[in-house]
Amino acid sequence: MRGEVRLQSFTEVPQAISAYGPLSDASGKKSFSIASLRLVKNAVFVARIEGVTTREAAEALTNLSLYVSREALPPPEEEEFYLADLIGLDAFVADADGKEVLFGRIADVLNFGGGDILEIAPSDGGETRLLPFTRQVVPRIDLTARRVLVVPPEEVEAQEPPEKDAGGDEPSP
């Protein structure tokens, strides 16, 4: 295991991760070239990174997210997009009258293994909201206008912070 790292690929064809050229960190300042790639299961690989020759150097890369250069990716097909294109889009909801009102802005697209999740920073501040990225929850995406329409599930809409009663932390009789 000297100098090898575990790598999870989120590319459309997981094995193609090494064909996209050097990967970079989030800042774009450090680049990493894959010297070899060995499939473990699904989209998880053991990779040897050029210049990483010791266990300590490999451990220094733990939890580091690596990115493919946008220029290395093929252009999306008609009606397709990259998930990264969603970050920064305004998210709107329809009010009771059908008028679209700003809900927040997409801060990130997450995936913990059960499907893509949109992290939305609310327009009124507060904690971000997580919404499943499904056609039912996100029925309309307009990349040109830089906006999406979201229909939050009832569970999300019902989440209100608990109110503290004026009497403090003691239960009332």
Curated annotation (Swiss-Prot):
GO terms for biological process: ribosomal small subunit biogenesis; rRNA processing. It is found in: Cytoplasm. Residues 78-157 form the PRC barrel domain. GO terms for molecular function: ribosome binding. GO terms for cellular component: cytoplasm; ribosome. It comes from the Bacteria. Pfam families: PRC_RimM (PF24986), RimM (PF01782). Keywords: Chaperone, Cytoplasm, Ribosome biogenesis, rRNA processing. Residues 152-173 are annotated as: Disordered. The PRC barrel domain binds ribosomal protein uS19. Binds ribosomal protein uS19. An accessory protein needed during the final step in the assembly of 30S ribosomal subunit, possibly for assembly of the head region. Essential for efficient processing of 16S rRNA. May be needed both before and after RbfA during the maturation of 16S rRNA. It has affinity for free ribosomal 30S subunits but not for 70S ribosomes. HAMAP family: Ribosome_mat_RimM. Belongs to the RimM family. This is Ribosome maturation factor RimM.
